[in-house]
Regions:
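PRPP-associated nucleotide enzymes
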Residues: 1-145
Length: 145
């Protein structure tokens, strides 16, 4: 419902889980960004209520506009196990020091994108990992590890 704005944002009316049982399973919550993190934390709490074993939060842009206190609390209470965000936005030293936080370094991929664009090359090989996966599998099968 985009007609209501509360505290400068559209509130989430409901989260609906449509999959099979998550009981005893590790679950990954994926979103484009963490602003306050409220919706991801609500989802994590619901997954734990549904008896998920571990909950991992993964996002591209971790803004953490509401601070880290609630994430600390959820980690300490066993609701979330890890939070992963990329280094495509500034990460505070406080965030980087959290035991539950994993920094996903995207520097290599940004450099490859810039290089391809500067050489007027296609980005499709960067975006489609099939070739890289097949090469890794071939090396693995050949005994190279």
């Amino acid at each position: 419902d985009y007609t209501k704005i509360i505290n400068g944002r559209n509130p989430i009316v409901a989260h609906e889980f449509l999959g099979a049982s998550v009981e005893g399973k590790d679950v990954i919550i994926v979103d484009d960004m963490i602003s306050s993190g409220e919706s991801m934390l609500d989802t994590a709490k619901e997954l734990k209520r549904m008896k998920a074993r571990k909950v991992f939060i993964c996002t591209t842009f971790g803004l953490f506009t509401g601070g880290l206190k609630k994430f600390d609390e959820y980690y300490e209470n066993g609701i979330i196990d890890r939070v992963l965000t990329t280094n495509l936005v500034y990460q505070t030293p406080e965030l980087l020091s959290k035991p539950y936080y994993i920094n996903v370094d995207m520097s290599k991929y940004i450099a490859l994108i810039i290089d391809n664009l500067n050489h007027d090359a296609s980005l499709s090989d960067l975006l489609n990992p099939t070739g890289r996966i097949n090469r890794l599998l071939a090396k693995y099968r050949a005994g190279e590890r």
